[in-house]
């Protein structure tokens, strides 16, 4: 029953939705805003940057909260799936979860630098870990995702595939200056 739950179409769609929509549309334009590509009526990009860069501003807090809400769901599904017997469905679920966790941390670390690294969910207050720890987890999760998804094809063009994992690995290596 647990495997059918975490591998169900509804659960899969919800995971995809949380990762994409949780951080809100702000996360998609953040680099343009803080990179000086957009500006206010004053014609100076710095005015926009100064008004949006407050940690309490919805622009920042909605991204942070959205990514961590998605991460909590991914970690929860992963903890359930890890306790199940080995099967192609289990491996697909774990591969997708590891991919999503890597993607979430890639987004977090490139936007915020040092972030709390949560390998499993906790109720405890957590502090920020060095960005290097987040990058290590991203690389580790992508390697694990490759292993879990190896030999499996995506159910649809829109789902995580081994090629998607390879593409995200390439992006990570570019960020880290690795070959």
Task: Walk through the language-model features, giving the residues of each.
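Short, conserved alpha-helical segments within structured domains
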Residues: 93, 158-165
């Amino acid at each position: 029953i647990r495997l059918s739950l975490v591998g169900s179409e509804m659960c899969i769609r919800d995971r995809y939705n949380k990762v994409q929509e949780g951080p809100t549309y702000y996360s998609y334009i953040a680099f343009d805003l803080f990179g000086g590509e957009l500006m206010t009526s004053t014609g100076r990009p710095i005015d926009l940057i100064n008004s949006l860069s407050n940690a309490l501003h919805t622009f920042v807090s909605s991204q942070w909260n959205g990514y961590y809400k998605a991460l909590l769901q991914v970690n929860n599904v992963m903890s359930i799936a890890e306790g199940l017997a080995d099967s192609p469905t289990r491996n697909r679920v774990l591969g997708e979860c590891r991919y999503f966790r890597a993607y979430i941390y890639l987004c977090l670390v490139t936007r915020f630098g040092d972030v709390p690294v949560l390998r499993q969910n906790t109720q405890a207050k957590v502090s920020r870990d060095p960005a290097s720890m987040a990058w290590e987890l991203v690389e580790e999760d992508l390697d694990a995702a490759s292993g879990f998804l190896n030999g499996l094809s995506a159910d649809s063009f829109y789902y995580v595939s081994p090629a998607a994992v390879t593409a995200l690995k390439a992006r990570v290596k570019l960020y880290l200056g690795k070959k």
